């Protein structure tokens, strides 16, 4: 606002601090030579020049009137701010190139690689995406629930795929755009467990898009069909587990199985809510403070009956559909 530079003088240093923080983060993750860093430096210089210009104009107005030289100073500051704005326009384009979307695939077993391989191949072809294939350790579970022998199968994955070492990757620094997991059990598998660091509840701290894709397919299950009663009962072991609730998105093999998942979850939640008053401390954190209706609405939005890569080119529910679904999650959904 002409004649009142005080608000701008307060805001400009804050904008500069934000730009410096962003530049530092880019340097740490991508290196100092990135064009986005140099654009941010020019942006900061333009803000600083505008700040000095406004400050000089403000101090030069001793009479309290808007003198001609002060108006000239304000026009100069406006030009400098326009220059800063142009830097931001350039920055948006360059950031899309310098800072690729990063997707981390977590697998504990090499034999499950086939369930995700087409997705990895499709994303590796994109120039705007950085793919990390990260085998993670898993443990046998003793009868008392404690973890015993550790297994790591990183050496068993196909050699043509670069492996990211889970011991050197810094999730907190990287904050990947998407994490794809295929083990939803967390601590609730009685036979084995991935390293607790990779439990779904913890992974949610590091990404806004946690995706669960089962490593297996099953026969279609109809909850209302008496012949499927046992199969529907057994769904409790892989559906009503923490990863399904913590994941932002779950991709299952068909619309029919999506309906079965939702029915199983609905019955599970009804039972959980009945026990809420008796055992409130035992409830999962992701289930607390929400009604059954709220949770079911959430699950309906999160579970997609798209297909499975294990079904190959099966029309309507094969690799193509799964690849397109993951691309939509990664590039279109907020």
Predicted stretch roles:
Residues 1-178, 183, 187, 316-330:
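N-terminal pre-catalytic "stem/leader" segment of glycosyltransferase-like enzymes
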Residues 297, 306-321:
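Structured N-terminal alpha/beta-domain signature
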């Amino acid at each position: 606002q002409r004649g009142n530079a005080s608000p701008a003088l307060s805001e400009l240093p804050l904008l500069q601090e934000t730009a410096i923080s962003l530049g530092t983060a880019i340097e740490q993750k991508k290196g100092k030579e990135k064009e986005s860093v140099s654009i941010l430096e020019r942006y900061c210089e333009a803000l600083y020049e505008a700040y000095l210009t406004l400050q000089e104009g403000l101090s030069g107005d001793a009479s309290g009137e808007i003198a001609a030289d002060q108006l000239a100073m304000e026009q100069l500051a406006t030009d400098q701010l326009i220059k800063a704005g142009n830097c931001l326009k350039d920055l948006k384009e360059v950031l899309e190139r310098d800072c690729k979307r990063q997707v981390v695939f977590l697998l504990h077993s090499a034999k499950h690689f086939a369930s995700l391989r087409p997705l990895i191949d499709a994303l590796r072809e994109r120039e705007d995406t950085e793919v990390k294939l990260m085998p993670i350790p898993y443990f046998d579970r003793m009868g008392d629930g404690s973890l015993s022998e550790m297994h790591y199968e990183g050496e068993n994955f196909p050699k043509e795929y670069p492996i990211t070492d889970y011991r050197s990757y810094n999730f907190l620094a990287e904050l990947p755009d998407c994490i794809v997991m295929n083990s939803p059990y967390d601590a609730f598998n009685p036979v084995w467990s991935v390293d607790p660091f990779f439990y779904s509840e913890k992974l949610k701290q590091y990404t806004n898009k946690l995706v669960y894709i089962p490593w297996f397919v099953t026969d279609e299950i109809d909850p209302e069909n008496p012949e499927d009663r046992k199969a529907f009962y057994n769904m409790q072991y892989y559906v009503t587990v923490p990863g399904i609730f913590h994941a932002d998105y779950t991709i299952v093999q068909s619309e029919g199985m999506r309906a079965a998942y939702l029915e199983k979850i609905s019955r599970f939640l009804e039972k959980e809510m009945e026990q809420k008053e008796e055992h409130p401390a035992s409830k999962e954190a992701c289930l607390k403070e929400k009604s059954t209706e709220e949770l079911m609405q959430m699950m309906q939005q999160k579970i997609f009956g798209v297909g499975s890569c294990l079904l190959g080119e099966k029309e309507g529910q094969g690799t193509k559909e799964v690849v397109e679904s993951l691309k939509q999650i990664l590039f279109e959904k907020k």
